[in-house]
Structures are given as structure tokens and as C-alpha cells.
């Protein structure tokens, strides 16, 4: 539920007024969908407000550490504040800086890595520089994001991305990693998928395909969407 400058979930609140990209469906879907089985350490690349990291903290065991990396100073400060205000402050860690620099310096591997990366090709700049950086694929391509994530992944670990459908297809074709899960996200029943949730591993496995429709033909939330997100949304 929206509340002033933020968004209130069942077990935590997100302030995002100083973040370029606000709480949105893409991040919520990824935070609810990512498989955390056998996870002892989790990394959120480009954490923004800290939304996905907090969702994964809620879903994971008490001994699991969650690290978020954010390059925008204002967003990083707000994510840190959101972490500290949550029930899981003792196992949430914020790292300020570029994800490529973090990968070179952190000296740690992670069991699960999540990313909701920028997805618009560089074109006409947004008026707000921070929002421009958050939305556009400028400094790093999606393939580079995935390559960085792979360098930080344990041998049996999993990387989870949310992307526009066409860009997800391109990413699958460009990587040597194996896509082990794919969920095509349909905004409304009868329409084509606009988003895709993808999971990658170093180990070869068959891809498990699924679909998720958010709204039915009468603009009501579908049962599958409610079941996926009911531990977070107040309205469910």
C-alpha cells in the first residue's frame, strides 16, 4: 500500500522518495519468484531502495546474509535506512559503489544473486540524471550485468533477472550460462508477455517454463499472482 513517500508491505516499509526508480511490479515479482533453496548468502545488484533485498530477507532463513550494492548516493543512503528500519537489520548489508568495482573487491561468492537492471537502450536522456542512470542501459549491457553476477556466483548458485521479454530473449542467447527457469509475465489475460523472469546457473539443466498473468479479463488480480505475492501485499 502506498503511504506518503513510500510503500508499506505486510512486514516492512519502503521509503523511496530519494530513489530514481520507485517500488514497482517488476521488483516485487522478482523478490517473490526467485528460488532461495539452499541459500546461505544473497546479493542484490543495483538494490535501489532495497526492495528486493528486503523481500528476500523476509523469505530466507535467519542465518542468511543479504548484501545490496547501489551506485547512486541518495538511493544507497535510503536503502541503508530501509534496511535499518526492518526486522532483518542484523543480516542486511549495503555496499555503496559500482557493481563492477564491487565484484573486483568483495572477495566473496554468493548462492543467489538477483538483479532488476536498467532496461532502456540509451536515447533521449531523462531530465533527472539519477532516473536516467537507473532506467537506461548506458554503462553496462545486460550481458555485462550477467557476466559480473556470474563472477560472484558459487558453483551451484543461481542468478535471477527480470527484464522486458525481448531483452530477456537476447540475454539468453548471449550467455554461456544455462537458463534453468523462465516465467513469461503477462500483464493482462489475452495479451502477449511483456516481462520475463529468468534464472541462470553454471550447471546444465533443462529449462522449466511457466507463465504468470497479473490481471484477468475483468482487471482483477489473478489467483496465481495473489498466491505469489500474498506474503507481501497488504491487500491480499
UniProtKB/Swiss-Prot annotation:
Keyword check for Transport: no
Protein name according to UniProt: tRNA1(Val) (adenine(37)-N6)-methyltransferase
Entry keywords, A to Z: Cytoplasm, Methyltransferase, S-adenosyl-L-methionine, Transferase, tRNA processing
Annotated family: Belongs to the methyltransferase superfamily. tRNA (adenine-N(6)-)-methyltransferase family.
PANTHER family: TRNA1(VAL) (ADENINE(37)-N6)-METHYLTRANSFERASE
UniProt GO MF annotations: nucleic acid binding; tRNA (adenine-N6)-methyltransferase activity
Entry EC no(s): 2.1.1.223
Catalytic class of the enzyme: transferase
One GO cellular component term noted in the UniProt record for this chain: cytoplasm
GO annotation terms (biological process): methylation; tRNA processing
Function description: Specifically methylates the adenine in position 37 of tRNA(1)(Val) (anticodon cmo5UAC).
Reaction catalysis annotation: adenosine(37) in tRNA1(Val) + S-adenosyl-L-methionine = N(6)-methyladenosine(37) in tRNA1(Val) + S-adenosyl-L-homocysteine + H(+)
Protein location: Cytoplasm
PROSITE patterns in the cross-refs: N6_MTASE
Superkingdom classification of source: Bacteria
Organism for this UniProt entry: Actinobacillus succinogenes (strain ATCC 55618 / DSM 22257 / CCUG 43843 / 130Z)
Gene3D superfamilies listed in its UniProt record: Vaccinia Virus protein VP39
Lineage, uppermost ranks: Bacteria, Pseudomonadati, Pseudomonadota, Gammaproteobacteria, Pasteurellales
One Pfam family named in its UniProt record: MTS
InterPro entries, A to Z: DNA_methylase_N6_adenine_CS, SAM-dependent_MTases_sf, Small_mtfrase_dom, tRNA_Adenine-N(6)_MTase, tRNA_adenine-N6_MeTrfase
Transmembrane segments: none
SUPFAM superfamilies reported for this sequence: S-adenosyl-L-methionine-dependent methyltransferases (SSF53335)
Keyword Plastid (UniProt): no
